[in-house]
């Protein structure tokens, strides 16, 4: 650990991911990342409350509270008490849209004894796609001409991954939850409210990030969609607009201040600033040092892509096929355009699991082999990457479609499925893996093209996250396929770093996010540049990818038509 200056001000960034929460201590005056701790969600790691085959993924709220408490306590245990006393603020980022039903006191229903083990009373994780039918209903209503097109600023297509689809679907599936739910809350708004003891619906401050990108909040129509529209989505939403919110805030503002109870529990000073929460990818862009016309790809199990632009360069235009354009949802002074891929690292994990199945099955009946199987599992993806890189890609390499978890961007459609084509008896595991990696790079290129085709400037592409740090093969593939430099920054915890930057601003250490970012954001680690000699082949294979996508869309439409006939 570097020398620690305990006389300077420090902040904590909390990054709530799909599997774990990370707590990062940062020197607010130098940007030094002092120490961090990661704690996994115990119930989630046991697979509780989830049904992957039905795309149901739920998080118990107690998992978040337990893991957050442990992570902060653990990270503070690594530094002197004088440093803990110098912490002046906490920033929070989370996955999203990850909403949950709350009662009239702001308590998530699963924290009540009668709902403790009810998945419908928990947080509905971002990748839960059980509400596809409700997303279809929202799109139908928004484009019917009977209402304002509330999808205008979320790319023109509402996703089953988002707030209102999930709230409506869960409420229709569970009468008891629908009756008890006073309102709904996003995880990124709930955590700051818990820390500040402002979770009561009348006190709870909501961030513009979640409201604008996922709940169709926009000032041009007075905030949230009108009640008649919400009721048309589902009668279970009757009256909910008055129980939601009318005001939103950017993350350079305080959601509240650390309560006495939480200060004692965590070992931090009472009354320190708690910044307004934001989604992980937005704070990751800030932590990566991004500014106007920089596209930041937060690469993990999926990707979330943030492109920030000057508002006047977009004007009154709406950018189609993306996940929203919201003023101030990342850097407060810039318009943030959100996109993303529903599966990235999950594609590689799926293939790994397919290859490992016979070894794991054998290990179940031969315990002595279990350790060997674990060793193979830990080395499998690096071995595949090395072999795939050595073999390279040519016109005979299989072509894959990266929609194993649906398509987020361009034009959200969670009914779509993945595919691998052009297989033959000579297709090897490395060749198939290469096709899967290429497909995720193709998906990344489709997002860049979606912006450029609508006259939105993309100057730099910045990649953050574990895959960006650990897989040169994947990053070089992305550079070759997209045809642009891919910048990888030094920090391996940019989302938590972005949260820490906002904590510093909310605490008054800096007057603006831009001035805080100039000191605290991560420097560049390395740049991957396109390989000139492969560009012609890449263009040909991307054209094949696009054609395969059209076929997969037709298959999805066929399946949907069959479902309608069966009803």
Swiss-Prot record:
- Report whether Ribosomal protein shows up as a keyword of the record: no
Q: EC top class, in one word?
A: transferase
> Which pathway does it take part in?
Carbohydrate degradation; L-arabinose degradation via L-ribulose; D-xylulose 5-phosphate from L-arabinose (bacterial route): step 2/3
Q: What is a single molecular function from GO for this protein?
A: ATP binding
User: What's in the keyword line of the UniProt record?
Assistant: Arabinose catabolism, ATP-binding, Carbohydrate metabolism, Kinase, Nucleotide-binding, Transferase
Recorded GO cellular component terms are: cytoplasm
Give the reactions, separated by semicolons, that this protein catalyses.
D-ribulose + ATP = D-ribulose 5-phosphate + ADP + H(+); L-ribulose + ATP = L-ribulose 5-phosphate + ADP + H(+)
List the GO biological process terms: L-arabinose catabolic process to xylulose 5-phosphate
Stored InterPro entries = ATPase_NBD (IPR043129), Carb_kinase_FGGY (IPR000577), FGGY_C (IPR018485), FGGY_N (IPR018484), Ribulokinase (IPR005929)
Q: What is its EC number?
A: 2.7.1.16
- Similarity remark: Belongs to the ribulokinase family.
Q: Which HAMAP family match?
A: Ribulokinase (MF_00520)
Q: What is this protein called?
A: Ribulokinase
Q: Which organism is it from?
A: Vibrio parahaemolyticus serotype O3:K6 (strain RIMD 2210633)
């Amino acid at each position: 650990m570097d020398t620690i200056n305990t006389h300077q001000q420090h902040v904590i960034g909390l990054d709530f991911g799909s599997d774990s929460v990370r707590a990062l201590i940062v020197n607010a005056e130098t940007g030094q990342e002092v120490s961090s701790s990661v704690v996994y969600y115990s119930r989630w790691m046991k697979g509780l409350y989830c049904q992957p085959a039905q795309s149901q993924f739920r998080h118990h709220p107690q998992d978040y509270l337990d893991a957050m408490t442990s992570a902060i306590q653990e990270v503070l245990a690594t530094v002197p008490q004088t440093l803990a006393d110098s912490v002046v603020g906490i920033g929070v980022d989370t996955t999203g849209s990850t909403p949950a039903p709350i009662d009239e006191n702001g308590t998530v229903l699963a924290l009540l004894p009668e709902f403790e083990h009810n998945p419908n009373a928990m947080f509905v994780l971002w990748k839960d796609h059980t509400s596809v039918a409700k997303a279809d209903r929202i799109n139908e209503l928004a484009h019917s001409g009977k209402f304002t097109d509330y999808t205008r600023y979320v790319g023109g297509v509402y996703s089953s991954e988002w707030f209102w689809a999930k709230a409506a679907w869960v409420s229709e599936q569970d009468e008891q939850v629908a009756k008890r739910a006073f309102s709904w809350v996003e995880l990124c708004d709930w955590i700051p409210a818990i820390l500040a003891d402002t979770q009561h619906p009348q006190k709870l401050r909501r961030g513009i990030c979640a409201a604008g990108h996922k709940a169709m909040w926009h000032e041009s129509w007075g905030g949230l969609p009108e009640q008649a529209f919400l009721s048309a989505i589902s009668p279970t939403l009757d009256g909910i607009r008055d129980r939601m919110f009318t005001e939103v805030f950017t993350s350079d503002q305080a959601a509240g201040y650390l309560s006495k109870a939480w200060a004692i529990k965590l070992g931090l000073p009472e009354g320190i600033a708690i910044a307004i929460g934001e989604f992980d990818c937005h704070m990751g862009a800030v932590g990566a040092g991004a500014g106007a016309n920089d596209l930041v790809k937060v690469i993990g199990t999926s990707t979330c892509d943030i492109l920030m632009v000057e508002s006047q360069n977009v004007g009154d235009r709406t950018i189609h096929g993306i996940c929203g354009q919201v003023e101030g949802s990342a850097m407060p002074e810039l318009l943030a355009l959100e996109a993303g891929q529903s599966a990235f690292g999950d594609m590689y994990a799926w293939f790994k699991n397919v290859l490992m199945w016979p070894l794991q099955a054998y290990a179940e009946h031969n315990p002595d082999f279990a350790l060997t199987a674990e060793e193979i599992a830990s080395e499998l993806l690096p071995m595949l990457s090395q072999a795939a890189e050595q073999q390279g890609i040519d016109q005979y390499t299989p072509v894959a479609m990266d929609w194993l978890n649906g398509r987020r961007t361009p034009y959200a459609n969670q009914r779509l499925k993945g595919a691998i084509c052009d297989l033959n008896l000579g297709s090897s595991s490395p060749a198939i893996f290469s096709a899967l990696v290429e497909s995720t790079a193709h998906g990344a290129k489709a997002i860049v093209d979606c912006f450029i085709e609508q006259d939105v400037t993309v100057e730099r592409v910045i990649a953050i996250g574990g895959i960006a740090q650990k897989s040169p093969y994947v990053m070089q593939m992305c550079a070759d396929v997209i045809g642009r430099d891919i910048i990888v920054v030094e920090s391996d915890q940019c989302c938590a770093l972005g949260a820490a930057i906002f904590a510093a601003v909310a605490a008054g250490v800096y007057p603006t996010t831009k001035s805080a970012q100039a000191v605290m954001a991560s420097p560049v680690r390395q740049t991957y540049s396109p390989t000139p000699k492969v560009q012609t082949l890449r263009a040909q294979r991307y054209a094949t990818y696009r054609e395969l996508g059209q076929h997969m869309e037709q298959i999805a439409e066929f399946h949907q038509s069959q479902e309608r006939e069966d009803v």
